[in-house]
From Swiss-Prot:
Subunit and partners: Monomer.
Listed GO biological process terms: cell wall organization; polysaccharide catabolic process
Gene label: cglA
Main enzyme class: hydrolase
pH dependence: Optimum pH is 7.0.
Single GO cellular component term: extracellular region
Protein name: Lambda-carrageenase
General function of this protein: Hydrolyzes lambda-carrageenan with inversion of anomeric configuration. Does not hydrolyze iota- and kappa-carrageenans, agarose or porphyran.
UniProt entry keywords in alphabetical sequence: Carbohydrate metabolism, Cell wall biogenesis/degradation, Glycosidase, Hydrolase, Polysaccharide degradation, Secreted, Signal
Length: 942
């Protein structure tokens, strides 16, 4: 834990390599303070230097600033995210303490000078909310989280009382599948509410589902065992914000709340504590006046607007100013270019404080609402710091790329299929790319609100479950002929078509007969059928595989068509290894199936890329895919700050995955002008797209999956319920652990694959994983009792670069334990086995041409006889910053090291290490010339 105290304002040297002092926007209406970190929450309180701003960053660092921009101190705490912070004087000295509900399971109390006062925690289950409540003359800290308990803590950090939610909760469970126990909840929010007589009550907002339930209010007298009142919440979906206001200034607090949702469900509410009445307003009513798509949290304060109290709601990039009627149809709307993580009202000055822009910003912004120009100042606000640097770094790549010529020694770029780009936003850019380059390839993508209404009674007579399934988002109105005409027309003047052809809710949106006819009409042009969220169990789903998917895959293999399997959660390292999926694993349909992911709500991205690449490297499939959507950052559906207006995170995600071999890209069409840089990088050959036998950044150590442990399979794919925590069950070690809805932001365990293999320390958003010793593939079993029989895929080494021929090392797991090849030994996840694997990964990394450390993601591929292409990417998905990639050369001697875009050259030191800077939000493509062709070297000489 590191604490930094600053006694005077200093100009901060930014991670982006420049100095930016306090910046003023529109003179005195808005002041911006540079923090060098991505600030996710802001509060205010009195410190020794006066009224101050308290911030917490993406990685959990708490810092304090004066309103003039002077930085007072910072405390890095645990290095894990803070789900909540609360600022209040608890010891009566007139200065506030800061309380942080941390994802590591602790509540941290920080003194007013930034030093740590105390830590409270009973387990490693994330704390989610914290507050202070007054009872007579005493103040107490109250906190709760995902262990389903409410804790009263003394001013000195001692546990005073525990209230289990099962004693009073009314949360129900619903739906199919494995469900948690009813009448229990996690603590979504805990807040004090003041009455005009000076007394306080405690409001707990409890929920048990992050996506499909808003939960309930439970109102307690201080220290009471049971709530005195309970109330349902009037708006739907998970609640993302709860705060107290006093709109009429009568001394009695009201509650404002906003949900965490997309525009169709977005809503705000205000609750009167006297009678528990609620007023609500649906933001979707004014959707046409707001940028429509994206996932946001509605956050409401009260301000004086031209002398009148007004509800002010931050909703992504918009501020809604709503009168007392609380009807958003009457709102004044202020629009900015960027969305912000948080807003807070400083009651001592009535100023508003904005947290950083969600697109990687690093500033906080102080809005003086007493200034008549504050509204226009907000609309014109252009954050500087990291956000400005990220955009400039992208422009610099564009400038360098304009002068780039692909070396003649390199082969032509492989086709990369963009299967869902919109041709409406920037048609000229797509047409230019198509006219200049053979790759990327843009398919005609069709959205299908209307799908085929066909007679399933005979074909699915023995499968009533799927015979009767329908997707509520679709209208089943088209005949086979109408379905055919709609889709087959897309082949005209294009390289092919793509579309949703089914979903886990209904795989049969288009009949097999109609789909075969559509594919045939393309005369060999590319067809990609997208199947999201395909997950099933039992005989009924086996019939779907055997009657629909496998026959369609066989037909697709012969007709240049693919099934883009956009699955979720841990599918590619769990369910795919169930017996019913053996045909996909066999390799017989390798040219048809494309493993892809829909990773919203997930916290296991480093696993999913290893799982997809493992099937690719093994020969089960010939290609794999990647998807970007606006809600990719929604690992915690209760706090969906997923409205990034500059999709730099998505650009880096796509570049990393394409550099790793992904050639089917399913992007949500947003800000395509910015994203089109990836198209140009591919077309010109600066972004090298490798064949699997060219990759050299894969660890020789791989983890092979036998049939998954049933509990691992179930829990790792059950991510919406938040109340699964069971102390006894969760003490059992698993190789892949902490994957259900209980663990947002939690730290990974030392024996977890994510920790020892990928260097992923938290359950969050590792879309651009580091794998400093080489990417550790998750593969089908290669040898012994658990190997699939009757496959045609060959051995793993057969499909990989020749250097791997004799250096591979396999370890077998079912997701819970490890097994030896004959199945006679079973070793626990936390046994000596994981240390053996970790050590073997370290040992074998020296056989790779190079490895990279230093917080940059990396990929190496052989691009020509004596040339390697090293791709480096800033790994900070939502908190980009300057990185230094420390490249260590192992089995090769570099002759020359050159950035292919900038021309900058590098030389290793005496230890064979070269440090290469990677700017915030950026990426580099490095050519490494070596002394001989690695394909001709014997592995024993490496």
């Amino acid at each position: 834990m590191k604490i930094k105290i600053l006694s005077a304002m200093i100009a901060s040297s930014l991670l982006i390599g420049c100095v930016i002092p306090t910046v003023k926007a529109s003179q005195s209406a808005i002041k911006s303070i540079e923090t060098n970190r991505t600030i996710t929450k802001v509060r205010t309180g009195m410190l020794s230097g006066g009224s101050s701003i308290i911030t917490t960053s993406y990685e959990g660092t708490v810092a304090a600033y004066k309103f003039n921009g002077e930085k007072l101190w910072e405390n890095e705490l645990s290095g894990f995210m803070n789900h909540d912070i609360w600022v209040q004087d608890i010891n009566g000295d007139g200065l506030v303490e800061i309380f942080a509900a941390n994802a590591d399971g602790n509540v941290y109390c920080i003194n007013s000078d930034g030093s740590l006062k105390w830590t409270f925690g009973l387990n490693e289950v994330p704390m989610n909310s914290v507050t202070v409540i007054s009872d007579a003359d005493e103040k107490y800290v109250v906190a709760g989280g995902y262990d389903k308990n409410l804790y009263y803590i003394s001013a000195n950090g001692e546990l005073l009382k525990t209230i289990e939610s099962s004693a009073y909760s009314e949360e129900g469970v619903f739906g199919d599948g494995v469900k948690p126990e009813a009448r229990t909840h996690t603590v979504n929010f805990v807040r004090p509410v003041k009455s005009s007589d000076g007394t306080e009550k405690l409001v707990v907002l409890g929920t048990n589902n992050s996506l499909q339930s808003s939960g309930r209010f439970y109102i307690f007298e201080p220290f009471a065992d049971l709530p005195s009142e309970k109330s349902r919440i009037s708006i739907k979906k998970g609640i993302g914000d709860l705060r107290t206001v006093d709109f009429d200034n009568d001394g009695n607090d009201e509650l404002t709340l906003g949900n965490s949702a997309q525009i169709g469900d977005a809503a705000i509410s205000v609750m009167n504590l006297d009678d528990l009445s609620q007023k609500k307003s649906q933001i979707n009513d004014i959707a046409r006046r707001i940028d429509r798509f994206g996932y946001r949290v509605a956050q409401t304060e009260v301000v004086m607007n031209e002398g009148t109290p007004t509800y002010l709601t931050l909703f992504g990039s918009r501020i809604l100013l709503t009168p007392e009627s609380f009807d958003v149809n009457d709102s004044e709307i202020l629009a900015n270019k960027y969305s912000y993580y948080d807003i807070w009202k400083d009651k001592s000055s009535n100023k508003l404080v904005l947290a950083s822009a969600q697109s990687g910003g690093s500033q906080v912004h102080i809005i003086d609402t007493s200034n008549p120009s504050w509204k226009s100042a907000y609309e014109e606000l252009e954050p500087q710091g990291k956000l400005a640097a990220i955009q400039e770094n992208t422009r610099e790549v564009e400038r360098q790329l304009s002068n780039f010529q692909k070396p003649t020694r390199e082969r032509a770029p492989l086709p990369v299929y963009f299967i869902s780009e919109s041709r409406n936003e920037i048609p000229a850019t797509i047409e230019r790319s198509e006219s200049l380059y053979d790759s990327p390839v843009f398919l005609n993508y069709s959205t299908l609100p209307n799908v085929e209404n066909w007679d399933r009674s005979e074909v699915l007579a023995d499968n009533p479950k799927y015979r009767d399934k329908r997707d509520r988002r679709k209208n089943y109105t088209l005949s086979s002929e109408e379905m055919f005409n709609k889709l087959s027309a897309g082949y005209e003047s294009s390289d092919g078509i793509s579309q949703w052809a089914g979903h886990g809710n209904d795989p049969y949106m288009i009949s097999l007969a109609t789909m075969k006819r559509i594919i045939s009409s393309g005369d060999g042009k590319k067809t990609v059928n997208i199947y999201p969220e395909i997950e099933g169990h039992g005989d009924a789903f086996n019939k779907v595989l055997n009657d629909h998917f496998y026959p369609l895959a066989e037909f697709s293999s012969e007709n240049n068509a693919n099934l883009f399997m956009r699955n979720k959660h841990t599918f590619w390292q769990s369910t795919i290894y169930a017996p019913e999926w053996s045909e996909l694993r066999s390799g017989r349909l390798a040219d048809a199936f494309v493993p892809a992911m829909e990773e919203t709500t997930d916290k296991s991205m480093e696993m999913s890329v290893a799982g997809r690449m493992g099937l690719w490297a093994a020969g089960s499939v010939d290609n794999w895919g990647e998807r970007y959507a606006r809600d990719n950052p929604s690992f915690d559906r209760l706090r969906q700050h997923s409205h990034q207006m500059v999709p730099n995170h998505a650009l880096r995600q796509i570049i990393y995955k394409i550099a790793s071999g992904a050639r089917y890209i399913n992007n949500f069409g947003f800000n395509q002008e910015y994203m089109s840089l990836a198209w140009e990088l591919i077309g010109k050959g600066a972004l090298y797209v490798p064949k699997r036998e060219e990759l050299l950044s894969l660890s020789p150590v791989h983890i092979s999956m036998k049939e998954p442990d049933p509990i691992y399979r179930e829990t790792s794919n059950n991510v919406k319920w938040t109340t699964f925590y069971d102390e006894e069950k969760d003490s059992i070690p698993y190789v892949f652990s902490r994957l259900n809805g209980t663990w947002p932001g939690a730290k990974t365990l030392p024996w977890d694959y994510s920790n020892y293999a990928a260097d992923t320390k938290e359950r969050r958003l590792d879309f651009i994983p580091k794998f400093p010793k080489g990417l550790v593939l998750i593969t089908p079993v290669q040898q012994g009792k658990f190997k699939d029989e009757g496959t045609v895929r060959g051995t793993l080494a057969d499909n990989m670069h020749p250097i791997y021929k004799d250096i591979m090392k396999e370890y077998i797991t079912d997701g819970k334990n490890y097994y030896n090849a004959n199945g006679e030994q079973v070793m626990a996840a936390d046994s000596v086995r994981y240390r053996q694997i970790k050590n073997k990964i370290e040992e074998k990394s020296n056989l790779l041409p190079m490895t990279v450390s230093g917080e940059a993601a990396w990929v190496v591929a052989q691009s020509a006889r004596k040339h390697l292409r090293l791709t480096l990417v800033d790994s900070g998905y939502l908190n980009p910053s300057n990185k230094v990639a420390k490249v260590k050369f192992n089995s090769v001697t570099p002759v020359a090291i050159v950035d292919v875009l900038s021309g900058e050259t590098f030389s290793p030191d005496s230890n064979g290490v070269v440090e290469i800077p990677v700017l915030a939000g950026a990426f580099r493509f490095i050519d490494v010339k070596i002394t001989e062709d690695l394909r001709n070297m014997q592995s024993s000489t490496l």
